[in-house]
Amino acid sequence: MSKLIKGIAASDGVAIAKAYLLVEPDLTFDKNEKVTDVEGEVAKFNSAIEASKVELTKIRNNAEVQLGADKAAIFDAHLLVLDDPELIQPIQDKIKNENANAATALTDVTTQFVTIFESMDNEYMKERAADIRDVSKRVLSHILGVELPNPSMIDESVVIVGNDLTPSDTAQLNKEFVQGFATNIGGRTSHSAIMSRSLEIPAIVGTKSITQEVKQGDMIIVDGLNGDVIVNPTEDELIAYQDKRERYFADKKELQKLRDADTVTVDGVHAELAANIGTPNDLPGVIENGAQGIGLYRTEFLYMGRDQMPTEEEQFEAYKEVLEAMGGKRVVVRTLDIGGDKELSYLNLPEEMNPFLGYRAIRLCLAQQDIFRPQLRALLRASVYGKLNIMFPMVATINEFREAKAILLEEKENLKNEGHDISDDIELGIMVEIPATAALADVFAKEVDFFSIGTNDLIQYTLAADRMSERVSYLYQPYNPSILRLVKQVIEASHKEGKWTGMCGEMAGDETAIPLLLGLGLDEFSMSATSILKARRQINGLSKNEMTELANRAVDCATQEEVIELVNNYVK
């Protein structure tokens, strides 16, 4: 008998495949157990080391093919740990001299090394501590005979099932085999949801307990259109959902006819539809879906899935690739936005009570200019290969923008002195995601070249509702009149100064929000590439004059529910 699990529809489509559980295995053992056959226990440990080497070599080679040599380098470091006699010998000695079982000897010795390395005031040694911790876990799994989940080694069609997907997890996903995913936690604007749309795979988030209700290898259906997961479907359900999937793909094929069409309302007003991307690997989807530019390039993904900072040269090559691929269309690059729900192990950032309100984004970059300046240099060098716009995230005060701009201009001068060509047509803007920034939009508009409204954070900060919390998800209201008023205020402030405003939050591709945003005068709608053609079809059927009237009425509503009802009455 099948089982229905409800969640939040995060990415359109229908996936049908076996479940692959991405959950932490049970690696517990009896720490006090002594062994009598010490030679046999040493052999068991040595066997686990060799098995780990074989496994890591496969993972490393697969990562190089799927993700590139830079992402594979982290596994080279892990292999070096397995060959380090200063680590291996003490473990073998502990087994021989103390009759310790292999698991205890491994964890005791590696814990000592990790503690020592983490206490050092040396970034390289702290990175080695992370390597030892990861390798120890892998060797322990072989000692205990427990298989570790490894999404990079998937070689058959699966649906990923997990508590949540971290940026590192998604960096390892092979789109050829991962048909979709379902998670316990998350909302439509969580990292895993955003990445599922970028990868163009169906996804359900916020199911609360799917990891407890699905077993490894269960056949499951992910209905990303309605938010349903069906576990072990009946034959009739399989047939019905296969038909639904075919109809979904048929509609996508029909939408392809709009790929090269203009985005223009019935009364002749043009709108610009751009794409959000995380890496150059997203470019084929951008081009296939007829994007008129890139409204958000999330550069933090260049820094993830690795054990050290990307070099200036690595960043330059990535930015150059994107700018060249877009053939002169506008590319808006957001500088490093780390913190909150996005962490880098090698930065060793302190834990904070409220990370979304803490040391992140532009705050981190201004404080740690050894991170910020190489990125700005790489961007400036790449600027001659296309139409580059640069925007700074999480700007709260005009002084933050001024300081960031001053650093950029300083690096621009340095590069020119070094003989590099730099474009003189780079626009500088900010993300508007803090209510204080929206409130002072008229002040910012005099100094920035453009605004990009990041509604994912603007909504949670304005309504004081954590977008990752299911318990307050009812307060995460994109159509709340307070949000619409802030958006209107930002757009009007930019237009008054002859500047433009885009939106790169998930709201920009939302079919209920699009009529409102069109009416408010939004210049650029930036969204997941998969949403572009649907948005184009929708906008091409709307009247700008009518949507302006709709938006003016919406900002005077009292509740989100009133706004939704108003939109539904206007747009039928």
From Swiss-Prot:
Mg(2+) binds at residues 433, 457. The active site is at 191 (tele-phosphohistidine intermediate), 504 (proton donor). It is found in: Cytoplasm. Its main location: cytoplasm. GO terms for cellular component: cytoplasm. It catalyses: L-histidyl-[protein] + phosphoenolpyruvate = N(pros)-phospho-L-histidyl-[protein] + pyruvate. Its EC number is 2.7.3.9. Coiled coil: none annotated. The keyword Cytoplasm applies. GO terms for biological process: phosphoenolpyruvate-dependent sugar phosphotransferase system. One of its GO terms (molecular function) is phosphoenolpyruvate-protein phosphotransferase activity. InterPro entries: PEP-util_enz_mobile_dom, PEP-utilizing_PTS_enzyme, PEP_util_AS, PEP_util_C, PEP_util_CS, Phosphohistidine_dom_sf, PTS_EI, PTS_EI-like. Keywords: Cytoplasm, Kinase, Magnesium, Metal-binding, Phosphotransferase system, Sugar transport, Transferase, Transport. Its cofactor is Mg(2+). Phosphoenolpyruvate binds at residues 298, 334, 456-457, 467. General (non sugar-specific) component of the phosphoenolpyruvate-dependent sugar phosphotransferase system (sugar PTS). This major carbohydrate active-transport system catalyzes the phosphorylation of incoming sugar substrates concomitantly with their translocation across the cell membrane. Enzyme I transfers the phosphoryl group from phosphoenolpyruvate (PEP) to the phosphoryl carrier protein (HPr). The reaction takes place in three steps, mediated by a phosphocarrier histidine residue located on the surface of the central domain. The two first partial reactions are catalyzed at an active site located on the N-terminal domain, and the third partial reaction is catalyzed at an active site located on the C-terminal domain. For catalytic turnover, the central domain swivels from the concave surface of the N-terminal domain to that of the C-terminal domain. The N-terminal domain contains the HPr binding site, the central domain the pyrophosphate/phosphate carrier histidine, and the C-terminal domain the pyruvate binding site. Belongs to the PEP-utilizing enzyme family. Homodimer. This is Phosphoenolpyruvate-protein phosphotransferase. The gene is ptsI.
